[in-house]
Every structure is written in structure tokens, then in C-alpha cells.
């Protein structure tokens, strides 16, 4: 597939590409860029998820390697369920993703987020993020900002660390994720 067709496929039904010139350069330089989307497995995969799922399918068709992060630790920090509930949803998500025919590498957050390198990266990000910037990012994540916890403030920093340490070239998300991804 030529570069123009790849770019057209990647841009299809996309609200925003934050750095389109960088995307064009990436497609010139890298035959198989790594694309990623992260999901909190806090309930069943639903119709709303299909927006990003279909974009991941477009990226696969455009020759990208796709990773899906099942962010179990994020779900715990964001108070979206008890550990056993989230573990069950992880199993359900894996089955559903497979049934949808996506050939993505599925990565479980807890498989790498407790490692020293990851924790050090989150701490470095915390050192360079102001409280105000962190609160703005957190407002996109926490439903009840007046009763938000410190763990929810940690969440956006983890999203940035996920992207960096998973070797991601293209991050797929909703428009609410753009505020978090500005840290990259």
C-alpha cells in the first residue's frame, strides 16, 4: 500500500491528528509504526468503544502494529471497581477483542506498571508537571472532581508513561485524551 493510501486510511473518520506533519514523516521512515489505544476494563466493551476499535482496525489495515492496553491498574486507581471485578472484565475484554478479529497485541497494565523503570518514569513526569496542569488533565478523567483522590491525579502521568514505555508511535484516543497526551 502506498504512503498516500496509508495516510488516507489513518485519517478516515478521525476528528484530530495532533501532529500531522510528524505522522507523515513517521509513515515515510517506519514501515510498521506501533499504534496503541488504552482502555479501562471496568465494564463490558460497548458501542462507544467501537469508534476507537474501528480506528485500530484501520491502522492494522494501513500496516501498523497495534497494541491494546487493558489498563487494570488505571481502573483501580480511578475507583472503577474492585480488583476481582476488574480481573473478570479483563477476561471478558480479551474474548471480545478476539471475537472482533483485531490482531492486536493485548497488554495488561499490571504486567509492567509495577516495574522500577515504569515507576521511575512516572516520578520523573510528576516532577515536571505542575499541580494546575495535573488537575486540568485529571478533570478529563475523574467524574467527581470535588471528591477526587490523589490516585486519580497519578492516572494522567501513567497514561504518558504507558505511551513512552510501550514504544508507541501513534496514540489513539478520544478528544478528552488530547489534554493528557500534551505531556508527551
Task: Describe each region flagged by the PLM.
Residues 1-184:
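NTP-dependent nucleotidyl-transfer catalytic core
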Amino acid at each position: 500500500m502506498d504512503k498516500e493510501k496509508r495516510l488516507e486510511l489513518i485519517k478516515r473518520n478521525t476528528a484530530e491528528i495532533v501532529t500531522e506533519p510528524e505522522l507523515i514523516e513517521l509513515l515515510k521512515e517506519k514501515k510498521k509504526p506501533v499504534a496503541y489505544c488504552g482502555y479501562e476494563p471496568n465494564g463490558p466493551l460497548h458501542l462507544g468503544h467501537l469508534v476507537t476499535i474501528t480506528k485500530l482496525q484501520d491502522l492494522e489495515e494501513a500496516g501498523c502494529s497495534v497494541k491494546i492496553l487493558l489498563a487494570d491498574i488505571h481502573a483501580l486507581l480511578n475507583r472503577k471497581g474492585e480488583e476481582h471485578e476488574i480481573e473478570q472484565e479483563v477476561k471478558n475484554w480479551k474474548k471480545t477483542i478476539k471475537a472482533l478479529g483485531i490482531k492486536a497485541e493485548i497488554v495488561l497494565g499490571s504486567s509492567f506498571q509495577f516495574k522500577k523503570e515504569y515507576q521511575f518514569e512516572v516520578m520523573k513526569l510528576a516532577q515536571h508537571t505542575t499541580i494546575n496542569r495535573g488537575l486540568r488533565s485529571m478533570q478529563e478523567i475523574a467524574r467527581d472532581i470535588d471528591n477526587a483522590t490523589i490516585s486519580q491525579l497519578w492516572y494522567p502521568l501513567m497514561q504518558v508513561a504507558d505511551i513512552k514505555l510501550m514504544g508507541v508511535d501513534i496514540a489513539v484516543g478520544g478528544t478528552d485524551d488530547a489534554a493528557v497526551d500534551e505531556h508527551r
